[in-house]
Amino acid sequence: MKVFCGRVNPTTGAMDWVEEDEHYDYHQEIARSSYADMLHDKDRNEKYYQGICAAVRRVKQRGQEAVVLDIGTGTGLLSMMAVTAGADCCYAIEVFKPMSDAAVQIVKANGFSDKIKVINKHSTEVTVGPDGDMKTKANILITELFDTELIGEGALPSYEHAQHNLMQETWEAVPHRATVFAQLVESTRLWSWNKLFPLNLETGDIKPHPELETCPGAPSVCDIQLSQLNPRDFKILSEVLCVFRVDFSCQVSSAPTSHPVHFTSLASGAAQVVLSWWEIDMDPDGSITCTMQPSWMYETQQSVPWRDHWMQCVYFLPKECSVTQGEVCCLTAHQDDYCVWYSLNKSSAENDPVCRERPTCHCGAHITWNRARFGELNDRHRTQQYFEALKKVVTPSSTCLCVSDGSLLPVLAHSLGAKQIYTLESSSIAQHLMKKLFQVNHLGEKIQVLHKSADSLITADFEDRKISTLIGEPFFTTNLLPWHNLYFWYSRTALSTNLAKDCTVLPLSASLHVVAVEFKDLWRIRSPCGMCEGFDVSIMDKMIKNSLNFRESQEAEPHPLWEYPCRALSEPIQVMTFNFTEPVPTEEIRASGSLNLVRSGQCHGAVLWMVYELTKEITVSTGLIGISEEMGECQWYPHRKQGVYFFSSILNPQTIPAQSPSSVSYSVTFIPKEGDIRMCFEPDF
């Protein structure tokens, strides 16, 4: 059955009514899931298998039947491991219906249907008894309920309920325990993702609103591939601290609690950020350990496992705190049932009661700007580029309009002497935030914030003035892919009647660029697995492929590529240009050609990004900013996500051609009516 779904188009700003299959949502969830990534995580799979074998063996040595409960079974992989290890029966719980159906098929295909029962319920709804979902309570608890923060997917409440209701009086658990580690650091780069720094201009400093300075920030964890952070970007202030452990073989509590750890500071500095990760011991002895520690904790880089479903965490302290080398401090990890946060005290005094509450943004900035956007606004080199460009177009007679969400361009325009400045904000929270920022810097009367869309503006909004200078970064909070910021072009088109005949537009244009790449690891998230630890999971591969084909097989997907190393196999090329000095055309813009591969390697996909021509002399890239000559290692703009188009024919180990492609053919079409860019890439052999 088909249904009509209303979606705001991020490029045009219009409400699009799209006819979708009724199962679109779960196809999208499967297509964007990390199931394939987990199946490719050999370190994780091997450690789980070893831990499961050991747990079954311990139960059998006590003369008991091994009854396994597997919560969040996914493909059924861990359940099949348990039965292969000698478990008598296994109850595999999976709440997501399409995944549960796949698990039933995978279990059957591997010949385990007689010992594994897949239950399509949330674990808290499972019943035990002669007529229940489980005939008897289990004595082995196997789970993979963890996220990067360990407890963010509700692991603690699930464990708590299962141990109370679904487990025997004593049980074995795989994993047996989890340990959370933390390290206190000073880092201007990371801190710039959480606070707005003062903006130093020739006419004076622009300071953030005091509310932003005292705001504890966003409640969600910042999870990144910490191994890709340059060690020069932070200063270590503490040893790696063991902050708390969770023993899954004992009764777990999801009640809020705190874990204070005293330490002696290794260096003097500004304590700003806590780097954190966890490890799980699969057995009571701790001889089978799976760790999420970053690469610099390993003796050799060859032994570092790569995974994207579990990364590392960056936590921002509520406020910056100076510490002195040799000073005794107390770092406290606070947790509730789903979240962890940190506070720092410089004495053994009781923690500030406020820190016991989950941090919540009260300034509006952490709701308006995500962490990458904070970093972009604090990027001094980028700001200087825009400042130099604005110098060329802003005059004392300029009436400026800024079309970008939460932008500081109006402040730059004012510092250059513009007569009148207006700025559009798409949300009431952003409008309130920017008004406060302008007011605290005595710019409230000089920069007017308009909470309207471009197509709803009338002459009266500009006090009967014509806009002489239209400016934008452009950046909009609704953007997912690089070309979604072409919303600036659609806004410029809607504003045509409000623009002076000789209106200057900055940027002048945007261009779409592409390069063919070999990823070090990111390709794994879209690569079929086939066999995993001796079990056939190809049904899962087909399920993911079907969901990708359902909608996303011919689409790029957004990834912050500074976290994912890759090599350029072709030279980057410009494939399409969008002229902002003219309205959006009615005719489609088409481009086709080929990327000649100049370096050897597995060509996993193409990366796309936008470059903005601010003036004839100044351009800014939201993607590639450098390539090493010899190996072709790419350096990416860190504040935006790039578009990645994976080549399915090369990602499948079973269909990889014997020879590498010599080039990649492309066809790209911009469809003005839809505000969409359709693309097709084909490796040429």
From Swiss-Prot:
Q: What is the uppermost EC class here?
A: transferase
Q: What does this protein do?
A: Arginine methyltransferase that can both catalyze the formation of omega-N monomethylarginine (MMA) and symmetrical dimethylarginine (sDMA), with a preference for the formation of MMA. Specifically mediates the symmetrical dimethylation of arginine residues in the small nuclear ribonucleoproteins Sm D1 (SNRPD1) and Sm D3 (SNRPD3); such methylation being required for the assembly and biogenesis of snRNP core particles. Specifically mediates the symmetric dimethylation of histone H4 'Arg-3' to form H4R3me2s.
Species of origin reads Xenopus laevis (African clawed frog)
Q: Which UniProt keywords apply?
A: Chromatin regulator, Cytoplasm, Differentiation, Methyltransferase, Nucleus, Repeat, S-adenosyl-L-methionine, Transcription, Transcription regulation, Transferase
Q: Where in the cell is it found?
A: Cytoplasm, Cytosol; Nucleus
Gene name linked to the record: prmt7
List the residue ranges forming a coiled coil, or say none: none
- Name-wise, this protein is Protein arginine N-methyltransferase 7
Q: Name one GO cellular component term.
A: cytosol
Any one Pfam family here would be: PrmA
Query: Listed GO molecular functions?
Result: histone H4R3 methyltransferase activity; histone methyltransferase activity; protein-arginine N-methyltransferase activity; protein-arginine omega-N monomethyltransferase activity; protein-arginine omega-N symmetric methyltransferase activity
The UniProt entry annotates the active site at: E144, E153
Task: Tell me which family the UniProt entry assigns to this protein.
Answer: Belongs to the class I-like SAM-binding methyltransferase superfamily. Protein arginine N-methyltransferase family. PRMT7 subfamily.
